[in-house]
Design a protein with these regions (language model features):
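Short secondary-structure boundary/capping segments within folded domains
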Residues: 28-31, 44-47, 62-64, 156, ...
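HotDog/MaoC-like acyl-thioester-processing domains
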Residues: 2-10, 54, 59-71, 75-134, ...
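Glycine-rich, pocket-lining loop/helix-strand segments that form or immediately flank
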Residues: 109-111, 320-325
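Short, basic/aromatic beta-hairpin or loop at an interaction surface
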Residues: 43-51, 172-179, 327-335
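Catalytic strand-loop segment that frames the active site of acyl-thioester-processing enzymes
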Residues: 1-39, 121-168, 263-323
C-alpha cells in the first residue's frame, strides 16, 4: 500500500521561525511534529513509537521571508500490518519574491502500531469555489485547563489562513497586497481538543472594488464535524485585475478534506448593535500593552492579542458579578462563548497601552450578551469593539445553566439599554 498527495500542514512562517532567512531546526521539528499528528488523524490510528527517522533530502539555502506560506506534503508506505513509513516534505510556497515552490526538507519516519486494524484513510477531494487556507493541529499552548482550544487561537489560526490567501493573491503583482480585516464574526459549533487536526476552508460571499467578504469553516478531521463558522469582511488595496485574480484562485481545483460543501450565511445578530462609544457606567475590565510577541505580519497587535485581552476582560467582568474563581471552583462552573462579533477600527502598534471597558447588553435566563471596547490609553481612540453571546456552564454535567439571581442583580447595574 502506497498513498501520496496528502497535505498535512499549511501555515505561515513568522519572524521567530527563521534565522538569517533560513528555517530554524526547532521550527522544522515543530512543523514535522504537527504533520505527524495530522497524519494520525488521516489514517485514524495513533502510532506507538517512531522506530527510525532519516533525512532523505535537505536544502539549507532556501531563502525565506517572514510571513511566507509553507506546506507539508505526505506520503504513506505500508511496510506490514503494524509498521508504516511516513515521508514528510516541507515546501516553501511560490510567492511574489519566490518564483517556484522549493523543497526545504524531506524526512522519513518509520512508525510502529500495536493495533492490527487496517488503515482507514480519510479521503480528500478536488473541489472548486473554495480555498483550503490552513491545516494544522490544536497545540498544548492553544488549550485551556480542559484541553479545549481557547477562543483567541481560533482567531489566530483564522488570521494565518487569511494571510495564506493573500500571499497567493499577491503573486502576480510582485509585491505584498495590503489588506485589513474590518469585521470578523465567529459562531462556535463543536469543541475541539488537544491534538485535533483542523482545516480552514474559505468561500467567497462577495468581492467588489476593494472589499472581500469570506465565509469560513473550521473542519475537525478527528470528529468529522465543523467546530466553528466565520464571516469576515476584508478591505484591500486596489490593483488592476485583482478581483479577477481572486476569482481565478477560487475557481481552480483545490484539495480538501471537507466532506460537505455547504456555506450558509451566519444567522443575523439579534437586537441593535450598541454604539461605538463607551457607556458611562462601563466597567474597566482589563489593562494590557502590545509587546513584540503580540505583533503580526503588519507589525501591529494581532487579532490573537486582541481576543486574548477579551478573554481576560471577561474573567474580570464575570468576577465583579460574583462568578469569581472561588465560586467557579466550588461549584465546578465554567463559561462558554457561542458568538463573537468584532469590529476593528484602528491598529494597535508596539508599545501601545490599551484598556477594556465592558457592559452587558442583554441578560437572559441562560444566555448573556455583553460588549467590550478596547481603548488606546494615550488618545482615547476606540481600537475595536466586540459583542459576545455566552453561557455559564456546568462542567460536570456538560450543560449550560440558569444564570443565578445574585449574578443577575449585579450584572443589571452594568446593563446598557439596547
Amino acid at each position: 500500500m502506497k498513498k501520496s498527495n496528502f497535505e498535512t500542514y499549511r501555515g505561515v512562517i513568522n519572524q521567530f521561525d527563521i534565522n538569517f532567512n533560513c528555517l530554524k531546526e526547532s521550527s522544522i521539528s515543530r512543523i514535522l511534529e504537527e504533520a505527524m499528528i495530522f497524519s494520525s488523524s488521516l489514517i485514524q490510528k495513533t502510532y506507538d513509537e517512531i522506530i527510525e527517522t532519516k533525512i532523505l533530502n535537505e536544502n539549507k539555502r532556501v531563502y525565506i521571508e517572514p510571513y511566507s506560506s509553507i506546506h507539508v506534503r505526505t506520503e504513506f508506505i505500508e511496510l506490514n500490518k503494524n509498521k508504516i513509513e511516513i515521508i514528510h516534505s516541507i515546501y516553501l510556497d511560490k510567492s511574489h519574491f519566490n518564483k517556484k515552490i522549493e523543497l526545504i526538507i524531506c524526512k522519513s519516519f518509520i512508525v510502529n502500531y500495536s493495533d492490527k486494524e487496517p488503515y482507514k484513510f480519510l479521503g480528500n477531494e478536488r473541489k472548486k469555489n473554495l480555498y483550503s487556507a490552513y491545516k494544522g493541529i490544536v497545540r498544548q499552548t492553544d488549550c485551556d485547563q480542559m484541553s479545549h482550544m481557547n477562543v483567541q487561537f481560533y482567531f489566530e489560526k483564522h488570521s494565518t489562513a487569511i494571510k495564506n490567501l493573500f500571499n497567493e493573491i499577491s503573486i502576480p503583482f510582485k509585491k505584498n497586497i495590503a489588506f485589513t480585516v474590518k469585521k470578523e464574526r465567529c459562531i462556535f459549533s463543536k469543541e475541539v481538543h488537544l491534538n485535533c487536526s483542523l482545516e480552514i476552508i474559505f468561500f467567497i460571499q462577495y468581492v467588489e472594488e476593494n472589499e472581500l467578504k469570506l465565509s469560513s469553516k473550521f473542519y475537525c478531521l478527528d470528529n468529522k464535524n465543523i467546530s466553528a463558522h466565520f464571516e469576515t469582511i476584508i478591505s484591500f488595496e486596489t490593483e488592476s485585475n485583482l478581483i479577477e485574480v481572486i476569482n481565478d484562485i477560487f475557481l481552480s481545483d483545490k484539495l480538501t478534506y471537507l466532506n460537505k460543501f455547504n456555506f450558509e450565511k451566519l444567522r443575523k445578530l439579534s437586537d441593535k448593535r450598541p454604539p461605538k462609544t463607551i457607556n458611562k457606567n462601563a466597567f474597566l475590565s482589563c489593562k494590557k500593552a502590545v509587546n513584540t510577541w503580540d505583533l503580526g505580519f503588519d507589525l501591529m497587535g494581532t487579532s490573537q492579542f486582541k481576543v486574548g485581552c477579551v478573554s481576560d476582560a471577561a474573567t474580570h467582568f464575570f468576577t465583579v458579578c460574583g462568578a469569581d474563581y472561588n465560586w467557579r471552583t466550588k461549584y465546578n462552573i465554567g463559561s462558554a462563548a457561542l458568538d463573537y462579533s468584532v469590529r476593528y477600527y484602528k491598529c494597535a502598534p508596539l508599545g501601545m497601552a490599551v484598556s477594556m471597558y465592558s457592559n452587558f447588553t442583554k441578560i437572559g435566563n441562560k444566555s448573556l450578551k455583553f460588549i467590550h471596547h478596547m481603548v488606546d490609553d494615550a488618545s482615547g481612540d476606540i481600537i475595536m469593539d466586540i459583542e459576545i453571546v455566552a453561557v455559564l456552564f456546568d462542567l460536570e454535567k456538560r450543560v449550560s445553566m440558569i444564570v443565578p439571581e445574585s449574578f443577575k442583580n449585579k450584572a443589571n447595574s452594568l446593563l446598557i439599554e439596547n
